């Protein structure tokens, strides 16, 4: 042992000091600080990691650094053993993983516990078949222009690990969630494109859940549902964006469940995105929620200041426009919600500058940015509408969702349906599902009742308008 101590905490502290110098700060904080040293026996160091996924990620991305550290601190015969805490979301991978240290640069020997589930690589199509397959991927949305910061670092790291070995890691399925415009779609395309680069024989498919639902509806109308399901079951890497749009569409959910199960059992990679975590997908079938809750779930946070500045700098370079630092800082500090809003504000600023023939100084930027931010509409949700209607009509939300036929409760329920149809992009089925499991015909009837009553009853119309004002504010 090179480090003259038998205290495991001292040995791991020595390892951390070296690691801090050879990996970047984000990686150090994310992947090494959570590790707990357990024991040192001879030349074998045992560490406790939060999950099997954590362990696999370390092996896949930091094995060379770990070899270096083990060699310097423990010696050339060092070995590293992980005790992975078993979490309920990943029951497939219990047990311990051992990685023999190779400080002399030799090949590492990875020994997995025998009770780990055997993982099959996807059956590969021929090269020509995979290349001819329409992936629906956008080549402009790649890892090279997916800018990284604290808010998306873990999601990107996991996506890159998956792309290196799709379907052959514990990160399957991979569930990405976060607010609209934070980069979920970009990351999905980048992951798919990287798989195509590294594994040209694999069939990769990106599809929005809206398109999936439209294709299913067409197949149902034409009596070709089996062909529809068979098409999706041939895919090696399936990426479905905005899975929350399947809420309330029970038949489409059933078809998706069949595809999901088939691909999962064959070891194919599944990637899903949503604006909320699986447990909050009210209106999704319980068995689907259970499958998704068992995925590796990673949230992309809203862009931090560092990321907003970097995006603005890169976009201005690409557009050939030079902006003063004070202008960049003002935009970055005041347009905070998402990347889409940030880029839209920059485009608006440049366009206004060209149209009026005025140089972009701080005064000009403040005027345009304030207009853009003020014009940005607040996202309206059904939950927000329920709260507003409950307050105005003095009916509890749970009463609205109940089976009660009392006139005041029915009326409040119908107002929620009416305003949800008017102010959100949710389907009638999704609205009905969130209003106590009602069908689209009930929602449509409720909307008509509200419209008719508003035409005849000024007091009722005033109450509906008050609810709308609450929603807007």
Swiss-Prot record:
InterPro entries linked to this entry: AAA+_ATPase, Chromosome_initiator_DnaA, Chromosome_initiator_DnaA-like, Chromosome_initiator_DnaA_CS, DnaA_C, DnaA_dom, DnaA_N_dom, DnaA_N_sf
Family matches, as CDD domains: AAA (cd00009), Bac_DnaA_C (cd06571)
SMART domains: AAA, Bac_DnaA_C
Spans annotated as Domain II: 76-135
One Gene Ontology term from the biological process aspect of the record: regulation of DNA replication
Pfam families membership: Bac_DnaA, Bac_DnaA_C, DnaA_N
Annotated residues for binding of ATP: 181, 183-185
UniProt region (Domain III, AAA+ region), positions on chain: 136-353
Quaternary structure (record): Oligomerizes as a right-handed, spiral filament on DNA at oriC.
Name of the protein this chain belongs to: Chromosomal replication initiator protein DnaA
Species: Porphyromonas gingivalis (strain ATCC BAA-308 / W83)
Top-level taxonomy: Bacteria, Pseudomonadati, Bacteroidota, Bacteroidia, Bacteroidales
Gene: dnaA
């Amino acid at each position: 042992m090179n480090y003259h101590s038998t205290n495991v905490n001292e040995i791991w502290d020595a390892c951390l000091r070296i690691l801090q110098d050879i990996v970047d700060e984000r990686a150090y904080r994310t992947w090494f600080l959570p590790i707990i040293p357990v024991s040192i026996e001879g030349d074998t160091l045992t560490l406790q990691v939060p999950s099997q996924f954590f362990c696999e990620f370390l092996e896949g991305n930091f094995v060379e650094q770990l070899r270096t550290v083990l060699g310097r601190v423990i010696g050339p015969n060092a070995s590293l053993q992980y005790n992975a805490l078993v979490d309920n979301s990943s029951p497939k991978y219990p047990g311990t993983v051992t990685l023999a240290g190779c400080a002399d640069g030799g090949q590492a020997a990875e020994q997995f516990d025998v009770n780990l589930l055997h993982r099959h690589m996807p059956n590969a199509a021929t090269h020509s078949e995979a290349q001819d397959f329409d992936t629906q991927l956008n080549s402009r949305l790649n890892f090279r222009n997916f800018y990284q910061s604290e808010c998306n670092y873990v999601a990107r790291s996991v996506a890159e690990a998956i792309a290196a070995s799709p379907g052959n890691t514990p990160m399957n399925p991979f569930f990405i969630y976060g607010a609209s415009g934070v980069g979920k779609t970009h990351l999905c395309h980048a992951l798919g494109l990287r798989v195509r680069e590294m594994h040209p024989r694999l069939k990769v498919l990106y599809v929005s859940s809206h398109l999936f639902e439209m294709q299913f509806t067409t197949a149902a109308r034409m009596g070709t549902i089996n062909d529809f399901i068979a098409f999706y079951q041939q895919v090696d890497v399936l990426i479905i964006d905005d899975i929350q749009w399947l809420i309330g569409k029970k038949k489409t959910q059933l078809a998706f469940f069949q595809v999901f199960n088939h691909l999962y059992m064959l070891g194919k990679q599944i990637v899903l995105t949503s604006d909320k975590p699986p447990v909050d997908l009210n209106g999704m079938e319980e068995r689907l929620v259970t499958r998704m809750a068992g995925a590796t779930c990673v949230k992309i946070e809203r862009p931090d200041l560092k990321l907003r500045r970097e995006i603005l700098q890169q976009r201005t370079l690409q557009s050939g426009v030079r902006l003063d630092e004070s202008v960049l800082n003002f935009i970055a500090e005041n347009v905070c919600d998402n990347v889409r809003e940030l880029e839209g504000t920059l485009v608006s600023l440049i366009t206004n500058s060209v149209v009026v023939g005025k140089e972009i100084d701080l005064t000009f930027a403040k005027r345009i940015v304030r207009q853009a931010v003020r014009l940005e509409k607040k996202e309206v949700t059904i939950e927000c509408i329920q709260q507003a209607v409950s307050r105005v009509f003095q009916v509890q939300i749970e009463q609205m969702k109940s089976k009660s036929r009392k006139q005041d409760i029915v009326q409040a329920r119908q107002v929620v349906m009416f305003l949800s149809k008017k102010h959100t992009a949710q389907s009638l089925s999704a609205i009905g599902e969130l209003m106590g499991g009602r069908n689209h015909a009930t929602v449509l009837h409720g909307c008509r009742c509200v419209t008719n009553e508003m035409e005849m009853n000024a007091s009722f119309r005033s109450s509906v308008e008050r609810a709308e004002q609450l929603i807007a504010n």
